[in-house]
Amino acid sequence: GGLAMEDVLNPRHGNPRIATELAGAALIARGVDVRTIRLPQVHDTTRAGLITPLAAQARRAGAVAYLGEGSTRWSAAHVSDVAKLYVLALEQGEPGARYHASGEEGVTARSVAEAIGKGTGLPVRSITAEAVDHYFGWMAPFAGLDMGASNAWTRARLGWEPTGPDLLTDLAAMDYSRLEGA
């Protein structure tokens, strides 16, 4: 799929966040000032969104897996950049606007898996669609989603400039032995 854009609200999209966006749209229709921040994989060297439980699952399974060629993407942003965006959205944002907190438009699943593999010392492998539910468990619905997101509009409207470390840098510095569930 293509990059998610801030000006698009697709009520049939498979991303679970659609429920909060629809609730926000209903409030906007009633005159409430709502500003939506679409969060990516928010990370630092201690946690990384859905990647943290993915790393814990890899330790339990004895291998790090990604679906198919690993070409699906997850947008990402350092926690300090996301915090700055919340402030900008409150101070300068427009009622009803949606903003993407994407410091990076999309990091491939394979790159993430390889970083986890290097950090944990576990082998990295591709799995088939048939094995996704078994390996990923509750995270299976996310394994095949291409969740890249553009931040061009957000940057232009709010002057937001992400400056924090990128996802792969934080994953390289993460202490995987300290992860919850590891």
Per-segment meaning from a language model:
Residues 22-45:
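Conserved beta-loop-beta element that borders a ligand/cofactor-binding pocket
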